[in-house]
């Protein structure tokens, strides 16, 4: 089999149709899966000796949240080291990173695997992986044909990374380096709320504004602060952390501003406070709402004038510190109640950010679950940790009052339980491995008897039309992908669509 010009042109066209990089990457992967007739495909970005999934097709959704470190995945390491097409024999002793991650075939291992390293010049920027359940699935394609596919994918990924770098540089001062511009903590999530949060982080990171990060306990406010710092011009200087809720009143002022020898009993030497430690960098004040009103007044002075006084010292010290503050309280309500200073609130909330709770992030829970599964796999030395369909369904329907932190602990506990009940180093997480409390549901209301306005044939055809429309929308109006989703032959689907009046 050989690729026609039309096939390659179609792949190139799909890359241009997408709105934004994510959509283009998904179109590329979906099209490749159709052209190569593989069971699963993935586009991965290479960064710091790990592969980060950008788009997948035919794989469990939690793969998008996983981070594949080369040390734990010898096949991916082989792809990263290769300068060309890598074909793994069906009897390869190297474990496939996607074993157990093809929906409906969790217990089966991938047989055919091809890896295509992607380069920008001499630099490895990513990889394409193609997997199939038949041992000889890719034998019909020559290395030259696969190189053409890799070249198209590498061009798309390289352009996306270049645009990302240029956009980041435009937000930073002119003397910032490209490396500083793109360096940023990974925040996992594709939900609208997280997408908006990432955009706001990019905007505010390049400035020197104080930021107030609000959100429920366990949502990841510290991770947001870290992302802001690492994407800012201050990234080369320290990010200093202080949990205000853990500060005893007697030592709080010393922790913030430092003290001199003899300032109080036990002050046997001079000591720098967090503000001095964060000079020219960033200070992250977690749980800012827990500070006393007296300390709030002193913190306000630092924000206003940029100088501090160590406890027991009459001299002032100048500091250049950006303050990021976080709280799980509604500080506006705290101001009205007289527990938080209004002037400090306005100083801190120049650019407020809100981290959405996990229950409002949709499928992000599955991506995060995949991330934590991969973490557990590496820590416990397991060959694979996968989520069953029942476990994924449970995670999607639980509300997680403890947010991401609760999910992380739940995954770790489930892995330990599942490992104890299985022999070997492969773990499949089932719903019974999670100890979530029962959720009391309201009694169902009596359903009204529907008024029948169609005969059985009309109702059936209306249902078929709507099902096909939804499948087409989810697959970018690609009929072949739609047929695969509906588990029917594409020719039969075309005939049915014509009979239903959906095609000429």
Swiss-Prot record:
One of its GO terms (biological process) is phosphorelay signal transduction system. Disulfide bonds: none annotated. ATP binds at residues 215-222, 278-287. It comes from the Bacteria. Pathway: Nitrogen metabolism; nitric oxide reduction. Residues 479-498 bind DNA. Residues 187-416 form the Sigma-54 factor interaction domain. The modification 4-aspartylphosphate is found at residue 57. Required for the expression of anaerobic nitric oxide (NO) reductase, acts as a transcriptional activator for at least the norVW operon. Activation also requires sigma-54. This is Anaerobic nitric oxide reductase transcription regulator NorR. The gene is norR.
């Amino acid at each position: 089999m050989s690729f026609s010009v039309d096939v390659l042109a179609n792949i190139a066209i799909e890359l241009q149709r997408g709105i934004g990089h994510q959509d283009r990457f998904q179109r590329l992967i979906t099209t490749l899966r159709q052209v190569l007739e593989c069971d699963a495909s993935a586009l991965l970005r290479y960064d710091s000796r790990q592969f980060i999934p950008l788009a997948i097709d035919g794989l469990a959704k939690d793969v998008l949240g996983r981070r594949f470190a080369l040390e734990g995945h010898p096949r991916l390491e082989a792809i990263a080291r290769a300068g060309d097409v890598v074909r793994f024999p069906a009897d390869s002793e190297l474990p496939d990173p996607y074993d157990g991650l093809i929906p409906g075939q969790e217990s089966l291992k991938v047989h055919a695997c091809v890896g295509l390293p992607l380069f920008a010049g001499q630099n490895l920027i990513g990889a394409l992986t193609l997997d199939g359940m038949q041992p000889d699935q890719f034998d019909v394609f020559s290395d030259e044909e696969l190189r053409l596919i890799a070249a198209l994918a590498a061009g798309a990924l390289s352009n996306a990374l270049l645009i990302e770098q240029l956009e980041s540089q435009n937000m930073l001062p002119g003397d910032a380096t490209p490396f500083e511009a793109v360096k940023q903590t990974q925040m996992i999530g594709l939900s609208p709320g997280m997408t908006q949060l990432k955009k706001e982080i990019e905007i505010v990171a390049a400035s020197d504004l104080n930021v107030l990060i609000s959100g429920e306990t366990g949502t990841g406010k510290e991770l947001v602060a870290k992302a802001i710092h690492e994407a800012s011009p201050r990234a080369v200087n320290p990010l200093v952390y202080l949990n205000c809720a853990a500060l005893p009143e007697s030592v709080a002022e010393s922790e913030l501003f430092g003290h001199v020898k003899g300032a109080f009993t036990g002050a046997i030497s001079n000591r720098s406070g967090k503000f001095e430690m964060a000079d020219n960098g960033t200070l992250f004040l977690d749980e800012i709402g827990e500070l006393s009103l007296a300390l709030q007044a002193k913190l306000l002075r630092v924000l206003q004038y940029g100088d501090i006084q160590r406890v027991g010292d009459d001299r002032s010290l100048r500091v250049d510190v950006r303050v990021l503050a976080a709280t799980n309280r509604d500080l506006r309500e705290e101001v009205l109640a007289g527990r938080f200073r209004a002037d400090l609130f306005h100083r801190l909330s120049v650019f407020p950010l809100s981290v959405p709770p996990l229950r409002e992030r949709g499928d992000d829970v599955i991506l995060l679950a995949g991330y934590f599964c991969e973490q557990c796999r590496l820590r416990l030395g397991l060959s694979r940790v996968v989520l069953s369909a029942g476990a994924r369904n449970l995670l999607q329907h639980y509300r997680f009052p403890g947010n991401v932190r609760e999910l992380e602990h739940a995954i770790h506990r489930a892995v330990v339980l599942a490992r104890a009940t299985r022999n070997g180093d492969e773990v499949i997480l089932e719903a019974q491995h999670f100890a979530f409390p029962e959720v009391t549901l309201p009694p169902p209301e009596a359903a009204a008897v529907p008024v029948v306005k169609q005969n059985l044939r009309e109702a059936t055809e209306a249902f078929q039309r709507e099902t096909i429309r939804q499948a087409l929308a989810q697959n970018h109006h690609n009929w072949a992908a739609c047929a695969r989703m509906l588990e029917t032959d594409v020719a039969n689907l075309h005939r049915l669509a014509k009979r239903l009046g959906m095609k000429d």
